[in-house]
Amino acid sequence: MIALIQRVTRASVTVEGEVTGEIGAGLLVLLGVEKDDDEQKANRLCERVLGYRIFSDVEGKMNLNVQQAGGSVLVVSQFTLAADTERGMRPSFSKGASPDRAEALYDYFVERCRQQEMNTQTGRFAADMQVSLVNDGPVTFWLQV
């Protein structure tokens, strides 16, 4: 399971002209689900995403996680993160989970975030989405479990 996380000052996702999720300061989480992923991996990734210390403390040091910084989370499904790009000029998606399994694990991940009393907004699984963000830093990390 892969999370591309970006520290943002604001982010939103729009589907068919409707804003489905919007946050102020916090994390934009682009989430990719691979074939061998399961609930245990989703739990570990959620723990890492919410616990990752990439927000500045009073001394300007990256020492706070999103909860400590008072931020929110916007989770957007992105199957392209599971692409195999090692050969050729076209990505292969053979590493990605089936759509049904990916959606179930995406929903599970979102619910785990919410269970941690985290303000969690979402896109719409498998939809054509427009994601807007202001990357703060820029600060972007690839987390994989």
From Swiss-Prot:
One Gene Ontology cellular component annotation?
cytoplasm
Might you give the EC number(s) for this enzyme?
3.1.1.96
UniProt-listed Gene3D superfamilies: D-tyrosyl-tRNA(Tyr) deacylase
Class in the EC hierarchy, top level: hydrolase
Task: Name its GO BP terms in alphabetical order.
Answer: D-amino acid catabolic process
Catalyzed reaction equations? glycyl-tRNA(Ala) + H2O = tRNA(Ala) + glycine + H(+); a D-aminoacyl-tRNA + H2O = a tRNA + a D-alpha-amino acid + H(+)
Superkingdom of origin: Bacteria
By its UniProt entry, which Pfam families does this protein fall under?
Tyr_Deacylase
Locus of motif Gly-cisPro motif, important for rejection of L-amino acids: 137-138
Give the record's family classification: Belongs to the DTD family.
PANTHER family per UniProt: D-AMINOACYL-TRNA DEACYLASE 1 (PTHR10472:SF5), D-TYROSYL-TRNA TYR DEACYLASE (PTHR10472)
How the protein assembles, per its UniProt entry? Answer: Homodimer.
**Name of the featured protein:** D-aminoacyl-tRNA deacylase
Give the organism, scientific name.
Escherichia coli O7:K1 (strain IAI39 / ExPEC)
What's the source species' lineage?
Answer: Bacteria, Pseudomonadati, Pseudomonadota, Gammaproteobacteria, Enterobacterales
